[in-house]
From Swiss-Prot:
Family of the protein in this entry: Belongs to the pseudouridine synthase RsuA family.
Enzyme class: isomerase
One Gene Ontology biological process: enzyme-directed rRNA pseudouridine synthesis
Keywords annotated in UniProt: Isomerase, RNA-binding
CDD domains with a match to the protein in the record: S4
GO molecular function: RNA binding; rRNA pseudouridine synthase activity
Record lineage: Bacteria, Pseudomonadati, Spirochaetota, Spirochaetia, Spirochaetales
S4 RNA-binding domain span: 7-64
Matching Gene3D superfamilies: Alpha-L RNA-binding motif, Pseudouridine synthase I, catalytic domain, N-terminal subdomain, RNA-binding S4 domain
Pfam families in the record: PseudoU_synth_2 (PF00849), S4 (PF01479)
Catalytic activity, as annotated: a uridine in RNA = a pseudouridine in RNA
Protein name as catalogued: Uncharacterized RNA pseudouridine synthase BB_0129
Enzyme Commission numbers on file: 5.4.99.-
SMART domains for the chain: S4
Length: 249
């Protein structure tokens, strides 16, 4: 179970030593406090990752309690690496997540350096393994954009199954959105699968953006932001995975 504190702005500032709760209420009435880039109003609550600004002081809300397991979603920007360390000093996706949390978490699978979108983090090893195991057929949905026109013949071949340098790739379904863009659904998480297939035909994709894993959607999560995935979503997905495991035994 995850219990997330969501204090009102004036309570949070008081806990940070800015002044009494009443004093902090007055600061808000006088429009001297901002949450991120918006002037705070009385009654506003802070959420995970919010930056509360008063004069030159900046406080980041990261106070919450974790019991048992935690499940997080990040909207990974391009040019962030899915690793805990990089000898070349590139930016790490974990750096957008770990500072907000007391528990050590790790990513469930990866998104390549140039790709963006939904990346899940957890401290639940079994759940992570179930998500990435090929037998589970967990869907991953992407929006792609190409500099060239999308070749539907390539997508048809990809859906039928295609070999690239002795590696077999297969698309579950696709939808062409316009001449340069398409929606792809995969049910395996092979490394750089989409990019490899298109590069095999000398097609460079300028955008690969993941918007869904199973029943977990990116929704309106902004680039670089993190949210806690509701346990109702996690439990629903776990239930589906457990049924598949039972049927395979």
């Amino acid at each position: 179970m995850i219990a997330l504190k969501a204090p009102r702005v004036h309570v949070f500032l008081a806990e940070k030593g800015v002044g009494s709760r009443r004093f902090c209420e007055e600061l808000i009435r006088k429009k001297l406090v901002r949450v991120n880039n918006t002037i705070a109003k009385l009654g506003d609550k802070v959420t995970l990752g919010d930056r509360i600004i008063y004069k030159k002081q900046i406080f980041v809300f990261k106070d919450f309690q974790i019991n048992n397991r935690i499940y997080l979603a990040l909207n990974k920007p391009r040019n962030y690496l899915c690793s805990n360390f990089d000898v070349d000093g590139r930016k790490l996706a974990i750096s957008l997540v770990q500072p907000l949390f007391k528990e050590r978490v790790f990513s469930i699978g990866r998104l390549d350096f140039k790709s963006s979108g939904l990346l899940l983090f957890t401290n639940d090893g079994k759940f992570a393994n179930d998500i990435i195991h090929p037998r589970q057929k967990v869907e991953r949905e992407y929006i792609i954009e190409s500099k060239k026109d999308i070749d539907e013949n390539l997508l048809i071949s990809f859906k039928s199954g295609i070999k690239v340098k002795k590696e077999f790739f297969k698309l579950k379904s696709y939808e062409i959105l316009n001449k340069n863009s398409a929606r792809l659904i995969l049910d395996e998480g092979k490394n750089r699968e989409i990019r490899k297939v298109f590069l095999s035909k000398n097609i460079f994709l300028k955008k690969i953006h993941r918007i869904r894993i199973g029943n977990i959607n990116l929704d309106s999560l902004k680039e670089g932001q993190v949210k806690i995935v509701p346990l109702s979503k996690i439990n629903s997905l776990k239930s589906r995975l457990e049924k598949l495991n039972d049927n395979s035994n």
